[in-house]
């Protein structure tokens, strides 16, 4: 009697089922073995994202020592020094567009929180607004300008003072370039009116320490002068003497070094004039 052969299609079906069953068992074993480490890594990533995107900002903002007087009716100034928007030429990493996006986003979030916490009436930009200002093309400048306006968006009622830096118009490793000075003045327009803030008794002057040029932002008959300069004037004795002889400022705001420093120059005449 001839034995009935085993159907080939049935054999293949059983083989496939066996393979699927073994694969399912293998995945279960893998999941059982790696489940806890995987959950830990995913949780760690989630915590990192939440911390970097929200908790770190909240924590830092609560640590800011911003003091307001009782029934505060003073004028609040917010100083933005050396934001240096990432450019299009020197950033040669594999993904420069991602770098620009991330840096812009970091600046935007920080500025929004600082603006809200300070209740600023005036925002002063102390130069180096763009990192590649002296070498970028017209198209690159226009792109950077659009990014700048998006990052540092503020109410129309907020007054603005713009001071140029060496990355904007030159001056540190090259001469100050007149064309760049003109471009800066055309696109970054100061909208400062001291009278509307009750500061009409003060003089406000911008000093370009790289070429000695001065720009009067607000002029009054008073001898009390506030100076804005990108380069730290107090670090250069001869320059400081010239500025004191010419303007005799009671207060100087500078940037450039990316470090917060306070210098006190006691002036009896200045104190007696209040």
Task: Place the predicted regions along the sequence by residue.
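Extended active-site neighborhood of metal-dependent phosphoesterases/phosphodiesterases
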Residues: 55-69, 98-99, 134-224, 262-273
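Active-site glycine-centered loops adjacent to acidic/histidine catalytic or metal-binding residues
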Residues: 82, 127-128, 165-166, 230, ...
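Short acidic, glycine-rich surface-loop motifs adjacent to enzyme active sites
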Residues: 221-236
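Loop/turn elements at helix/coil->beta-strand transitions in domains of secreted/extracellular proteins
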Residues: 47-53, 73-75, 119-121, 156-160, ...
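N-terminal active-site segment of His-dependent metallophosphoesterases
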Residues: 2-142, 147
